[in-house]
Amino acid sequence: MIKILVSNDDGITAPGIAALSNALAKHYEVMTVGPDRNCSGASNSLTLTNPLRINKLDNGYISVSGTPTDCVHLAIREFYAHEPDIVVSGINAGANMGDDTLYSGTVAAAMEGRFLGLPAIAISLVGRELKHYDTAAYYACKIVAGLIDSPIASDQILNVNVPNLPLDEIKGIRVTRLGARHRAEGMVRMQDPAGREIFWLGPPGEEQDASEGTDFHAVANGYVSVTPLTVDLTAFEQVPKIKQWIEQL
């Protein structure tokens, strides 16, 4: 039977990871390993200064005192006699589109699976008052089945964003590119109860490139967005231009 490792960045008790695990378990052998707390925005960070501790929960899930990347790395290296076939990360509570992908622990967990040589998918539910995790789980199962039948390149993952809509209101699936946001808003300056100055991150920037073909556009119009992401961040088209002046230094 196909073996799937499920992880996330919202934490092992988040509703999204349960919805995803339960849906996939109807068709595949599933192991669920996630952080013991919310690690949203953790990106690809690893825990290097402390040991990782694990705790097996009553439902069979395994919590880890680390980041999403830690969870996937640990699970693949230590919890399987034979590696899983696919890594699926999610279902994230909120969008991972455009620039968000660089900060996302959800995307990072999938990337770690890819770094270790496995096909991987990150899936997120987009909207306010999130409640349609079943819709995202349904599409996760469909996309996993498609990935099994039609593998993608070894340096890529699929980043999936699903509108927060009932299943019968989804218009279809679109293969997209990443959109882009304007610069993030400023910090929020406050005082703690002792009168000391503290800062919170402000809201993300508004959508700058949400044109047709982007993930932003697809989701805003009721479509599931599937964006292939590459692990290699090299801007190949810039190499000749930069090489010209670098070699003159």
Swiss-Prot record:
A GO term from the CC aspect = cytoplasm
User: Where in or outside the cell?
Assistant: Cytoplasm
Q: What is its main location?
A: cytoplasm
Question: Which Pfam families does this chain map to?
Answer: SurE (PF01975)
What residues bind a divalent metal cation, as annotated?
9-10, 40, 92
Record GO terms (molecular function) = 3'-nucleotidase activity; 5'-nucleotidase activity; exopolyphosphatase activity; metal ion binding; nucleotide binding
Q: Which reaction does it catalyse?
A: a ribonucleoside 5'-phosphate + H2O = a ribonucleoside + phosphate
Q: What UniProt keywords apply to this chain's record, in alphabetical order?
A: Cytoplasm, Hydrolase, Metal-binding, Nucleotide-binding
Cofactor note, please? Binds 1 divalent metal cation per subunit.
List the EC numbers from the record: 3.1.3.5
Disulfides per UniProt:
none
Function per UniProt: Nucleotidase that shows phosphatase activity on nucleoside 5'-monophosphates.
Q: Describe the family membership recorded for this protein in Swiss-Prot or TrEMBL.
A: Belongs to the SurE nucleotidase family.
Tell me what this protein is called.
5'-nucleotidase SurE
Organism expressing this protein natively: Shewanella loihica (strain ATCC BAA-1088 / PV-4)
